[in-house]
């Protein structure tokens, strides 16, 4: 099975252009962050990018409109990472209906506990949009089995007990946790948070089915040097393809 490359970008005024670059340079699934005023799971790079997007006037409606206008030009799958407050404000059913309409493959909601996620999934089950499960390093075996049983799309394993973007300070039991998860499910188990270098990728993707890279890609797009960014993306893809 090909290892999944899941880059994260901020939903800003350039996000469609950035999606096209990612789509053309090895991404399997693109994660689009919806800017939010209190992003509890985000590190400083993504938080600053979100604040800039808010100042640009980017809203969930802007993101939906841009996806609607450009969905035929994006070949890979894309998911939204959004805080629950945005979904509630929009209206749960209306939000997922719009996601389906604009081609969103799945939604990641980092601040919604598992039990409430299950209730939400029941409410929006008529829409063809997956709710992606996050599993933290602190989850015990019973909780893991329960989450895995209902997981869809892919499982996003948080590699550390911290916000995004820390440099490679992965939890010491991460690989064991990944192996344990993979033994209980057939859907891809990916690792995210703090992955940046070729060494990180090689280290984790030997066990995981893929990696999510966020802060490093957000930082590179903010620097607006597309040539360097494309070189980095190709390196990531090549590294994953050797595993």
UniProtKB/Swiss-Prot annotation:
Reaction catalysis annotation: (1S,2R)-1-C-(indol-3-yl)glycerol 3-phosphate + L-serine = D-glyceraldehyde 3-phosphate + L-tryptophan + H2O
Disulfide bonds: none
Keywords: Amino-acid biosynthesis, Aromatic amino acid biosynthesis, Lyase, Tryptophan biosynthesis
Superkingdom of this protein's organism: Bacteria
Pathway linked to the protein: Amino-acid biosynthesis; L-tryptophan biosynthesis; L-tryptophan from chorismate: step 5/5
Protein EC: 4.2.1.20
GO MF entries: tryptophan synthase activity
Active site (record annotation): 31 (proton acceptor), 42 (proton acceptor)
EC main group: lyase
Name this polypeptide is given: Tryptophan synthase alpha chain
Source organism (scientific name): Staphylococcus haemolyticus (strain JCSC1435)
Gene assigned in the entry: trpA
């Amino acid at each position: 099975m090909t290892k999944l490359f899941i880059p994260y970008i901020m939903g800003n005024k350039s996000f469609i252009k950035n999606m096209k670059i990612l789509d053309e340079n090895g991404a399997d699934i693109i994660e689009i962050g919806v800017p939010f005023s209190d992003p509890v799971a985000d590190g400083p790079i993504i938080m600053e990018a979100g604040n800039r997007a808010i100042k640009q006037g980017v809203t969930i409606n802007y993101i939906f409109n841009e996806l609607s206008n450009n969905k035929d030009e994006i070949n890979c799958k894309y998911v939204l990472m959004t805080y629950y407050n945005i979904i509630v404000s929009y209206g749960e059913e209306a939000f997922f209906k719009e996601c389906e309409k604009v081609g969103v493959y799945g939604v990641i909601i980092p601040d919604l506990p598992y039990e409430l996620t299950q209730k939400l999934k029941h409410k929006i089950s008529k829409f063809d949009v997956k709710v992606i499960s996050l599993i933290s390093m602190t989850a015990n075996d019973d909780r893991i089995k329960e989450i895995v049983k209902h997981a869809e799309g892919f499982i996003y394993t948080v590699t550390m007990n911290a916000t995004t973007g820390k440099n490679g300070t992965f939890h010491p039991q991460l690989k064991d946790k990944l192996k344990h998860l993979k033994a209980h499910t057939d859907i891809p188990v990916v690792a995210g948070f703090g992955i940046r270098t070729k060494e990180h990728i090689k280290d984790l993707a030997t066990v995981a089915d893929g990696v999510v890279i966020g802060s490093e890609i957000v930082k590179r797009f903010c620097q607006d040097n597309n040539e360097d960014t494309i070189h980095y993306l190709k390196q990531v893809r090549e590294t994953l393809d050797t595993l």
